[in-house]
């Protein structure tokens, strides 16, 4: 059967290493007791084949590429109606899943961050994600405070998920090979059903802090209307990258007068 042509505008790089594909699928731990798994951007099904061998969950795949969809239907007839031709970013995931489900994929680099922000929107339904990203992006998501790659996305994602960097993937195991290495990470939903601070204010404080990441919080937070707070407190001598997620919660409450 003729292979699917990788399309540059879709950010497609097809993984062709079977052991790495198996290792990615093995990254799923069933954290959160889900019974459904959604694979985003399956391409030619290198991950799909291993997902279908696992009887612990039921697999669906979604791809925006019509050529890939037709290929998958022929190669994996057992998927039947579980091959979805659509745009994950535009879909209402509750239409596909009334209950919990995990997400896995070799994510297109050009939309990988958007995928995880959509995951945040459905965080009560998605207890686990295993995904491949550009290495520097994967490292940023998993970074802890004090690391130069720690940033806005690190904090916002880690407010709701525990993130673990699993392994690095070299360029040559893809067709076509990307120009950078890739990294696989796993996100596991933590126990926070609600943040211990106002969510909108938290997002605002995090973004303001990192938008001027080289400056101390005393200067970086000037864009926020801070009232009745002494800016002489030691925390304002720090830069955003030095604060843990919990310290951002505390800072948000402090600035909100709570």
UniProtKB/Swiss-Prot annotation:
It comes from the Bacteria. The keyword Cytoplasm applies. S-adenosyl-L-methionine binds at residues 13, 15, 41, 63, 87, 106. Its EC number is 2.1.1.182. Belongs to the class I-like SAM-binding methyltransferase superfamily. rRNA adenine N(6)-methyltransferase family. RsmA subfamily. This is Ribosomal RNA small subunit methyltransferase A. Specifically dimethylates two adjacent adenosines (A1518 and A1519) in the loop of a conserved hairpin near the 3'-end of 16S rRNA in the 30S particle. May play a critical role in biogenesis of 30S subunits. Keywords: Cytoplasm, Methyltransferase, RNA-binding, rRNA processing, S-adenosyl-L-methionine, Transferase. The keyword Transferase applies. GO terms for molecular function: 16S rRNA (adenine(1518)-N(6)/adenine(1519)-N(6))-dimethyltransferase activity; RNA binding. It catalyses: adenosine(1518)/adenosine(1519) in 16S rRNA + 4 S-adenosyl-L-methionine = N(6)-dimethyladenosine(1518)/N(6)-dimethyladenosine(1519) in 16S rRNA + 4 S-adenosyl-L-homocysteine + 4 H(+). It is found in: Cytoplasm. PROSITE patterns: SAM_RNA_A_N6_MT. GO terms for cellular component: cytosol. Coiled coil: none annotated. Its main location: cytoplasm. It holds the Pfam family RrnaAD.
């Amino acid at each position: 059967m003729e292979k699917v042509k990788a399309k540059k505008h879709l950010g497609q790089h097809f993984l062709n290493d079977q052991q790495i594909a198996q290792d990615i699928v093995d990254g799923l731990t069933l954290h959160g007791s889900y019974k459904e798994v959604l694979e985003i951007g399956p391409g030619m099904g290198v991950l799909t084949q291993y997902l279908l061998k696992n009887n612990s969950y039921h697999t669906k795949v979604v791809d925006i590429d019509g050529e890939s969809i037709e290929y998958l239907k022929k190669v994996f007839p057992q998927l039947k109606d579980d091959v979805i031709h659509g745009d994950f970013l535009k879909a209402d995931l509750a239409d596909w899943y009334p209950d919990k489900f995990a997400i896995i994929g070799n994510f297109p680099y050009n939309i990988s961050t958007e995928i995880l922000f959509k995951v945040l929107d459905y965080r009560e339904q998605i207890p686990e994600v295993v995904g491949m990203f550009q290495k520097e992006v994967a490292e940023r998501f998993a970074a802890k405070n004090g690391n130069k790659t720690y940033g806005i996305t690190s904090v916002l994602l880690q407010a709701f998920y525990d993130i673990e960097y699993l392994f690095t993937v070299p360029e040559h195991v893809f067709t076509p090979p990307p120009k950078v290495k890739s990294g696989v990470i796993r996100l596991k939903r933590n126990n926070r059903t609600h943040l211990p601070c106002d969510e909108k204010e938290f997002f605002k404080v995090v973004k303001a802090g990192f938008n001027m990441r080289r400056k101390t919080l005393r200067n970086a937070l000037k864009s926020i209307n801070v009232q009745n707070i002494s800016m002489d407190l030691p925390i304002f001598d720090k830069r955003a990258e030095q604060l843990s997620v919990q310290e951002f919660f505390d800072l948000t409450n402090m600035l909100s007068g709570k």
